Structures are given as structure tokens and as C-alpha cells.
């Protein structure tokens, strides 16, 4: 369910805004989206894992807040990250 170092580094490299960027909103949204998709697949197999479901809802809320921040700051960055990750239809 968690990301190992190589997967995190790969996500950072694909979504960073400059060379040393590791914590921008884009990178955080990308990492949260990957963790959300992994946890969702875990919950499909383990229906009664309620503590993981609670963690999933917290991650979804955090991603939603970051995306709303990005939409308010820069509409262009928001639409780019949405298109890149494919999280909104």
C-alpha cells in the first residue's frame, strides 16, 4: 500500500516543476493518487478492513484540498495535473 523509494522518485521526476522540487502540490497530488489507487485495490479484496477505509477517506480529503488549492492558485497547473493523472472525468 505504501510506495517504495524508487516509485516515489519516479513520481517526483515525472511531476516536479523544477530540478530540486520534491514537495510541490503537483508532486503531493501524484503521490496521494498512487497511494489511493493501491489502497482502493486492497479494499476490494479486504472488504472489512475499516481502518484502511478510514485512511483512504483521509487521503482523498487531503488530495481534494490540494486540488482546490491548485485550482485557486493556477487554473492551468490544475488542469494539467488532472489531465496527467486522469482523476476527473
Curated annotation (Swiss-Prot):
GO terms for biological process: translation. Residues 1-25 are annotated as: Disordered. GO terms for molecular function: rRNA binding; structural constituent of ribosome. Keywords: Ribonucleoprotein, Ribosomal protein, RNA-binding, rRNA-binding. One of its GO terms (cellular component) is cytosolic small ribosomal subunit. Residues 8-25 have a biased composition (Polar residues). CDD domains: Ribosomal_S15p_S13e (cd00353). InterPro entries: Ribosomal_uS15, Ribosomal_uS15_bac-type, uS15_NS1_RNA-bd_sf. Transmembrane segments: none annotated. The keyword rRNA-binding applies. One of the primary rRNA binding proteins, it binds directly to 16S rRNA where it helps nucleate assembly of the platform of the 30S subunit by binding and bridging several RNA helices of the 16S rRNA. Forms an intersubunit bridge (bridge B4) with the 23S rRNA of the 50S subunit in the ribosome. Part of the 30S ribosomal subunit. Forms a bridge to the 50S subunit in the 70S ribosome, contacting the 23S rRNA. Belongs to the universal ribosomal protein uS15 family. This is Small ribosomal subunit protein uS15.
